[in-house]
From Swiss-Prot:
This is Lipoprotein signal peptidase. Coiled coil: none annotated. It is a multi-pass membrane protein. Its EC number is 3.4.23.36. GO terms for molecular function: aspartic-type endopeptidase activity; endopeptidase activity. It catalyses: Release of signal peptides from bacterial membrane prolipoproteins. Hydrolyzes -Xaa-Yaa-Zaa-|-(S,diacylglyceryl)Cys-, in which Xaa is hydrophobic (preferably Leu), and Yaa (Ala or Ser) and Zaa (Gly or Ala) have small, neutral side chains. It is an enzyme of class 3 (hydrolase). The keyword NAD does not apply. This protein specifically catalyzes the removal of signal peptides from prolipoproteins. Pathway: Protein modification; lipoprotein biosynthesis (signal peptide cleavage).
Length: 161
């Protein structure tokens, strides 16, 4: 028997996803308006953490830079898949958090890729020479961490919240 789709099935998933998308898009709007032109950097802790406005045509942390037009379609496929999954399958709270964060990141960066052909990155950890990233990337990584944590609990004792 097919499971019916319901937005009410996993409320935390939807709340996290919507909040994450809004925060990501507002942060990128702020960066694009306050830090113009591209390349502007503001040291918050000089040599350690800066806001640096860059345009990324690649994936997270600038992987596949310049040749990744397919990423917008991947973002769309992941987003549609997660929406269908969360609308049909009851999930534990930690799973809702994880999948909601991943959806927020996929949609946040997907919006940028479809509208502009690039993603705005601005979080710049210079102390460890880490690639510049954005809140959507953070959201995806939080989601992965939450799902990994949830995987430590056996499915047989799984209690849906």
């Amino acid at each position: 028997m097919a499971r019916s789709f319901s937005l009410a099935k996993n409320p935390l998933f939807w709340q996290v996803a919507i909040a994450g998308i809004i925060l990501d898009q507002l942060s990128k709007l702020w960066v694009s308006q306050a830090m113009d032109p591209v390349g502007t950097t503001w040291p918050l802790w000089s040599g350690v953490f800066h806001f640096t406005y860059v345009l990324n045509t690649g994936a997270a942390f600038s992987a596949f830079r310049g040749g990744a037009g397919w990423l917008k379609w991947l973002s769309l496929a992941v987003s549609v898949g997660l929406i269908i999954f969360a609308g049909k399958v009851p999930l534990r709270k930690l799973e809702q958090l994880g999948y909601g964060c991943i959806l927020a990141g996929a949609v946040g960066n997907g919006i940028d890729r479809f509208l502009f052909g690039h993603v705005i990155d601005f979080l710049d950890f210079r102390l460890i020479n880490f690639p510049i990233f954005n809140l959507a990337d953070v959201s995806i990584n939080i989601g992965i961490a939450a799902l990994l944590w949830a995987s430590f609990f056996p499915v047989s004792s799984r209690k849906v919240d």
